[in-house]
Amino acid sequence: MSLEDPFFVVRGEVQKAVNTARGLYQRWCELLQESAAVGREELDWTTNELRNGLRSIEWDLEDLEETIGIVEANPGKFKLPAGDLQERKVFVERMREAVQEMKDHMVSPTAVAFLERNNREILAGKPAAQKSPSDLLDASAVSATSRYIEEQQATQQLIMDEQDQQLEMVSGSIQVLKHMSGRVGEELDEQGIMLDAFAQEMDHTQSRMDGVLRKLAKVSHMTSDRRQWCAIAVLVGVLLLVLILLFSL
């Protein structure tokens, strides 16, 4: 199987989440079957955990469906047999049906009626029936479960507090970096101004040098012209001298 295919990673997470949800669902069903008023804390915690777990599973199933769509759109890349692809679709459909079954039970009229009746009994402080010894044992188990839930909530609160402290430290570091970046930006702006002034000075110096070079070229041209006239005068003088000598002979 291609290492780029993420199906099996997500599938394992979904299977584990469904198993956890089934455990919560079983406990939730047991709470619905108890004749005495159920503790609000345990019932609320179980209901919320189950509802959140089912919602998370649905999101994971959507991810699995996306991976199946990717494989179907790129059969040459993944080279997945048709039987394996169908097996994946069956798995997603089976998990979705299990999730939907639990969701339907949670919103069924029977469950809603029980929750409303349980809330009324808790508020009134009156149990629905006389507690038997087995009910007392169940109450003891519920009390132990409540203590466990309280401990877990306290642990989660400590973790959240530590995360808040870490976020504050990160926020402080970000502020320091922001201040440093502002200082660096100001220094870069100052250096840019200095470079602009230096460029202007270089342009002015270049202009002055061009003027000097033009003057030197002009003087050099004038000097060259004088030398040419002097040479012509000397040649004319020599020619006249030769003519005089020829005629004198």
UniProtKB/Swiss-Prot annotation:
Membrane-topology descriptor: Single-pass type IV membrane protein
Protein name per Swiss-Prot or TrEMBL: Syntaxin-10
Alphabetized InterPro entries for the sequence: SNARE (IPR010989), Syntaxin-6/10/61_N (IPR015260), Syntaxin/epimorphin_CS (IPR006012), T_SNARE_dom (IPR000727)
Subcellular location per the Swiss-Prot or TrEMBL entry: Golgi apparatus membrane
GO biological process, one term: intracellular protein transport
Modified residues (Phosphothreonine): 110
Pfam families (alphabetical): SNARE, STX6_10_61_N
Coiled coil: 41-69
Modified sites of kind Phosphoserine: 108, 134, 140, 143
